[in-house]
Every structure is written in C-alpha cells, then in structure tokens.
A protein has these predicted regions:
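An acidic, glycine-rich "communication" segment
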Residues: 328-443
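Proline/serine/threonine-rich low-complexity linkers at boundaries of modular beta-sandwich domains
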Residues: 17-79
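Structural motif
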Residues: 169, 196, 291-296, 321, ...
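Active-site rim elements
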Residues: 249-252, 356-367, 470-480
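Ligand-binding face of N-terminal immunoglobulin V-set domains in extracellular IgSF glycoproteins
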Residues: 81-106, 110-117, 122-185
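Extracellular low-complexity, Gly/Ser/Thr-rich intrinsically disordered linkers
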Residues: 265-267, 417, 425-498
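Helical hinge/lid and interdomain linker segments adjacent to catalytic or ligand-binding clefts
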Residues: 134-149, 154-158, 164, 250-336
C-alpha cells in the first residue's frame, strides 16, 4: 500500500457511515507537546498524525520522528501490537487479553480507569510484568466476517474486589517502546447505584473496520475489494465479530463521548454503575434497579432484548437519558461465536441487495420516537448553534438562557427531531427544549430538536438530539457551563436530589 494510504489507516478513523467531529477524544496518558498547536490552546485529537496537519497548525517543536520514550500508535498494516478482550468483567473477576506483537517481543500492559481525578482524566490502576509476545495467526475470514477468536491468551488481568467499577483501558506497549495500542473494557458492579451508564459496545463493533489493511477488514459500513478500494454498505459485512481488536489505535471510533460524560459525572459525585450494551442484551444487568439509565454516546444499533429491557425499566419508573443522536436506528441480532461463546457475533443485514427487507426499527413498526420522544433526522455537515426553547422549564433553570438564544456549535454530527406523523409515547408531560435550523449536505433546510417527556410511571425520558451534548460536558475546547447546568438539573431530578 502507498504511504499516504497507510497514514490514513494509522488513525483508525477512516470515513465511516457517520461524521463525528468528536470521535475518540484526548486520552491523558498520551499527552505531549505535539498535541497542542500555537498559542491558541487548540487541541488536535491525539490520534491525528501531526505530519498530516498544515504547517501553521503544528507545534513549534514538532519532530517528524517520534521522540525517544514516546511510542507511536500501532497500525493495522504492520500490526506492531494489537489486542482484544471479552469487553466486560465483574469485581473479583478476570479478563483474558489476546495480543499479537509484530515482530515478536515482550510487551507490557498498563491499566487505567477513566474518571475526573482532579482533571487528570484517568488513574493508573495496575501494570503487568513483561509479557512474552508473539505474532498471532492471521484473522480468519468467512465471507466479510473477520474473527480472531483463535488467538492465544497472552495475559490474564485479575480485577481486585477493591477496584471501583467503571470504564477501563488496557494500554499495550512494546518492550522497545516504539508502539502502543489499547483494549477498552468495563468493570461491572454487583451493587445498585442511582444511575447505570451503558457503554454502546454493540455500536462500537458495528463501526469497527479491523483490520484497516486495505484487504481484509470489514465493518457494517465498509469493506475492501481485491484492488484495495474501500467499498460502501452494499458490499460491507452483514455479520461482524467481537473477537478482534478495534481498528487503528485500538479504541472504538465514538468512545470519547462516553469518556466526556464519565469525567464530568464523577467530578460532581453522581453515583454510577457501569455495564455494556451487550450486558443489557444478555440480561446480566437489571435496569429496573436504577433511578436512571445513561446512554452517553452514539448508540445506533439495538437488539430486541435491549429495547424490551429499557421499555420495561421506563414503565417501572426508571428514567432514560440519551445524550447523543441517531439512537436505536438499526435492529440487530447477536449470536454465539465459533467457539460457542454467546453473543460474540453481531448481524445487521442492511442495504444488501440479497436482503431487501429493511431492518430499521421505524420500518419494523417500532419507530425510535415511541421510546425517546424524537428520532433520527439526518447528518449535520458543520456544527451549528442550538436554539433553545421553553427556557422557563426546570431543565434550563440557572442557565440564564432565554427563548431563541443560541448555544454555539451544540448541534453537530447527526441530529434528531420530532416527527409529527410518527406516534409518540404515552406521557403526562412533554416539552421540546430546542429547535435548531441547519442545512444538510444538499443544502436543504432541516432542524434539530431536544426532547423531554414524563411517562405515566413517573420516569423522565430525555433525548439531546445531537452528538455534541456529551463533549460539552468535559471535552477540552468544547465545554459549556449552560449544558453542564442543564444536565445537572436533569440528573438531580432523576436522582431525587431536590
């Protein structure tokens, strides 16, 4: 492959089926001078190669060669170090890491927990000894489905009982300190909490193009042909495997949204439990035990068991907080993997010539709006202001906002709105908190809306209708105190602080 193509794949952020202006976000253990440009304080996401930036935006001390002691991100062409794990475990449980190292050499694992931690963004929790590394077998390919379930276990992480449940990242570093990669995972808790945060690992896997090598990789959006050309959805995979690394840096494309919310929520002391969407699907967590469920980021792919569990929770009085857009758009199925482990394959037969029937929830007679109060409308080419409405509502209390005022760049990525001809959920109260005009990629005028309703059970259901809400809570360069206050008003009401 050409050098220019290789550089694109190094980022792990090829053009997927969605424009996400926030993506993976900055991570604290990757901070360095080459991530800040000029005197403006503008932060460029850590996964962007400075060599590809205009010279005017590079740091004055930018060196095209990685500094000694500062590893580069592994890529899927060289596969210098890549790994994956099951995705979640319990306190007192264990997690098996399967890692490939090319060329073979020892490597280390550093485990971090995402949180505020006085502004640090994460805390170092554990470090492995040096682990023997080997080149694992090539991924197995069946049709467009790529799986590494046959990789050998490299290292087992024992999770102590005294750790705090949460979102964790295992950082893999080669012994020569030249390359680094990541394995995200979740530590669940047996105890109840006020709020259950559900990390959207089903959607993360739908977008995973591993390996981004110009030949083998496939997601539900893309695949390559024999010429190395990237193909679109009609030729993409219909089934993808959880048993493989994430492309590029080893982190899901949209993971930064969840990390933004976690840092903010833990800073202000909200009582959180953690689980993955696959846990919700499998019934490993009971959402009715919580006052509220938090969906912190892009959460597009839902199975029927996921939706039914959330509907039951709402009808039992559990509030729902959707902090992104394009939620619950596609219906998917989860199946056991080749080794018999449950829920290791994700299937969504969308936009395929041989399967013309739609698998959109709205086309199956269950539009998203029936649960969330609004539903997906379209992509937002460039961030635009959110125009607030009904500012006398308690959600906007203390923000200082008045009807018609704007919150800059808060509508971004994708948007939701209310569809008048689509059934609404039963409610005792309902309000639209924003109505924001924008133009789509064809220049056609559209609008975004933010919704809140109260179910007969007393549950509040909030939907932000934009990708930019979570980043406004704790993303450097994107925070907005009014969004922070509105979110606090919502969660305080759900947690019955008042």
């Amino acid at each position: 492959v050409g050098a220019e193509q290789t550089r694109r794949w190094e980022s792990g952020a090829l053009a997927h089926g969605v424009t996400d202006p926030f993506g993976q976000g900055p991570l604290p253990w990757l901070r360095g001078a080459d991530q800040y440009f000029g005197d403006t304080g503008l932060m460029v996401p850590w996964y962007v190669d400075p060599a590809l930036l205009p010279a005017a935006r590079r740091s004055p001390d930018y060196d095209p060669k990685p500094a000694l002691g500062r590893p580069r991100t592994s890529d899927d062409v060289g596969g210098q170090i890549k790994g994956f794990a099951a995705g979640a475990t319990d306190l007192g449980g264990s997690l098996d890491l399967r890692v490939s190292v090319n060329p073979p050499q020892e490597f280390t694992v550093d485990v971090y927990r995402i949180g505020h931690y006085g502004g640090a963004g994460a805390r170092h929790m554990a470090a492995s000894p040096r682990v023997s590394g080997l080149v694992q077998p090539a991924p197995l390919v069946a049709g467009r489905t790529v799986s590494c379930h046959h990789w050998w276990m490299s290292w087992r992480l024992q999770v102590p009982l005294h750790w705090t449940p949460g979102a964790y990242v295992a950082v893999l570093t080669t012994a020569d300190h030249r390359h680094r990669s990541h394995i995200p995972f979740t530590v669940r808790a047996g105890r109840a909490a006020d709020l259950l945060l559900l990390l959207p690992d089903v959607t993360w896997q739908a977008y995973n193009l591993y390996p981004e090598d110009g030949r083998t990789g496939a997601s539900l959006y893309h695949a390559w042909n024999e010429k190395g050309e990237l193909l679109g959805e009609p030729a993409a995979a219909t089934t993808v495997s959880f048993d493989r690394p994430y492309a590029g840096a080893g982190l899901p494309l949209h993971i930064g949204h969840a990390y933004d919310f976690i840092r903010w929520a833990e800073r202000y002391g909200y009582d959180l439990a953690y689980a993955n969407a696959t846990d919700l699907h499998a019934g490993r967590v009971d959402p009715t035990r919580y006052r509220g469920l938090i969906f912190p980021g892009h959460d597009e792919y839902w199975s029927a068991p996921m939706r039914r569990a959330v509907e039951r929770a709402r009808d039992g009085g559990t509030s729902l907080v959707f902090l992104s857009a394009n939620t619950m758009y596609w219906q998917v199925q989860l199946h056991q993997g080749p080794a018999g482990e449950p829920d290791r394959l994700l299937t969504c037969s969308k936009r395929q010539a041989e399967t013309p029937a739609s698998v959109l929830w709205r086309d199956l007679g269950e539009p998203e709006q029936q649960l969330m109060g609004i539903q997906y409308s379209g992509r937002v080419p460039e961030p635009v202001p959110m125009v607030v409405h009904n500012t006398d509502h308690w959600v906007w209390e203390g923000t200082g906002l008045r009807d018609g005022e704007e919150i800059p760049a808060l509508v971004a990525g994708e948007s939701d709105r209310y569809f008048p001809r689509v059934p609404l959920p039963e409610s005792t109260e309902r309000v639209l908190l924003a109505h924001s005009p924008y133009k789509d990629v064809r220049g056609v005028g559209r609008h975004q809306e933010t919704s809140l309703y109260r179910a007969a059970s007393g549950a509040h259901v909030f939907a932000s209708g934009t990708f930019a809400w979570s980043p406004a809570l704790d993303r450097p360069g994107h925070t907005d105190e009014r969004v922070q206050r509105a979110t606090a008003n919502l969660l305080d009401r759900i947690c019955k602080v008042h």
